[in-house]
Swiss-Prot record:
PANTHER family xrefs: 30S RIBOSOMAL PROTEIN S14, SMALL RIBOSOMAL SUBUNIT PROTEIN US14M
Entry keywords, A to Z: Ribonucleoprotein, Ribosomal protein, RNA-binding, rRNA-binding
The organism of origin for this protein: Bordetella pertussis (strain Tohama I / ATCC BAA-589 / NCTC 13251)
Assigned protein family: Belongs to the universal ribosomal protein uS14 family.
UniProt cross-references to HAMAP family, sorted A to Z: Ribosomal_uS14_1
A molecular function GO annotation: structural constituent of ribosome
Assembly: Part of the 30S ribosomal subunit. Contacts proteins S3 and S10.
Full protein name: Small ribosomal subunit protein uS14
One GO process term, biological-process aspect: translation
A Pfam family matched in the record: Ribosomal_S14
Length: 101
């Protein structure tokens, strides 16, 4: 089990990223727009830099929904390889069966 503080930190980052997603997209559109003046684009870049660092979605970490482990997480299931195997063997993952050939 991961430390609760780390799990909560990631949850907080996800909420912050959702909160600022529209504003970030708007500013990035201005920055990428070649028809805008250099001054407007520069001001948009400064405003983007003023946003909280944790509002950037790349600072989030995929974590297992059961254990909070940050590595070996399958995106499709939201589980680490350990928990995925354990739950699949118990039949708790719909549609997943043990391979045999």
């Amino acid at each position: 089990m991961a430390k609760l503080s780390l799990i909560n930190r990631d949850i907080k980052r996800a909420k912050l990223a959702d909160k600022y997603a529209a504003k970030r997209a708007e500013l990035k559109a201005i920055i990428d727009d070649q028809s805008k003046t250099d001054e407007e684009r520069y001001q948009a870049r400064l405003k983007l830099q003023q946003l909280p660092r944790n509002a950037n979605p790349t600072r989030q970490r995929n974590r297992c929904v059961v254990t909070g482990r940050p590595r070996g997480v399958f995106r499709k299931f939201g589980l680490t390889r350990h928990k995925l195997r354990e739950m699949a063997m118990k039949g708790e993952v719909p549609g997943m069966t043990k391979a045999s050939w």
